[in-house]
Amino acid sequence: MGTPSDRTTTLSLCLAVCVVVIAVGTGWASEAGEGAHQVDSAAQMKDFGWRVLNFAVLAALLGWAIAKAQVKKALNERQVKIERSLREAEQSRDAAEQKLREYSGKLEHASREIEEMRGAMLRESEQEKQRIIAEARAAAEKIAGQATLSAEHEVLKARSALQAEAGRLAVQLAATKLAGAIGKEDHDLYVDDYLKKVEQFK
């Protein structure tokens, strides 16, 4: 759709064409009327030539005005297209910058999350390491405690056996003395046997 100035120019051109047509028609009509009273063909040709020249000049001016209006219209349309292209380019640039900011923010957020996950994994790994070390120490202490208890139990068992054997020998020695049949050799034999058994339970 044309602008108000384009419509005004077109209307002016139409009026100019109408004026030219009316002027030419009037000239031809007057020439035909005068032809009945005048016989000077040279004057008629001269007048007709001037009228044709005037018409040619007016037609040239009219053509120039029309061409100028078309060029102006084309330039206006070109300017509108350029302005629209510039606006679209600016909008595209703004949209691209917005996307860049969004992606930059997302990338920064993802980097922070990755760093946080890495820190959490390192902390969990260190905690798991400490837990395993603590469990290993507890197991070693438990084994050592069980070994100590087992050794103490064996010592107590050996002591009990030694005490029982010592009691048995004492009873046997007492019985022999009571019987009056023990001699020095038998006494030494009993003592040596007792000492050997004591050495075995150490």
Swiss-Prot record:
Principal localisation = membrane
Q: What does this protein do?
A: F(1)F(0) ATP synthase produces ATP from ADP in the presence of a proton or sodium gradient. F-type ATPases consist of two structural domains, F(1) containing the extramembraneous catalytic core and F(0) containing the membrane proton channel, linked together by a central stalk and a peripheral stalk. During catalysis, ATP synthesis in the catalytic domain of F(1) is coupled via a rotary mechanism of the central stalk subunits to proton translocation.
Return the protein name. Answer: ATP synthase subunit b
List the transmembrane segments.
9-29
For whether the record's keyword set contains Phosphoprotein, the answer is no
Q: Name one GO cellular component term.
A: plasma membrane
Q: Which PANTHER family match?
A: ATP SYNTHASE SUBUNIT B, CHLOROPLASTIC
| Top-level division of the source organism's lineage | Bacteria
Report the GO molecular function annotations. Answer: proton-transporting ATP synthase activity, rotational mechanism
Bilayer topology reads:
Single-pass membrane protein
Q: Does the keyword Hydrolase apply?
A: no
Q: How does it assemble?
A: F-type ATPases have 2 components, F(1) - the catalytic core - and F(0) - the membrane proton channel. F(1) has five subunits: alpha(3), beta(3), gamma(1), delta(1), epsilon(1). F(0) has three main subunits: a(1), b(2) and c(10-14). The alpha and beta chains form an alternating ring which encloses part of the gamma chain. F(1) is attached to F(0) by a central stalk formed by the gamma and epsilon chains, while a peripheral stalk is formed by the delta and b chains.
Where, per UniProt, does this protein localize? Answer: Cell inner membrane
Family, according to the entry, reads as follows: Belongs to the ATPase B chain family.
Keywords, sorted A to Z: ATP synthesis, Cell inner membrane, Cell membrane, CF(0), Hydrogen ion transport, Ion transport, Membrane, Transmembrane, Transmembrane helix, Transport
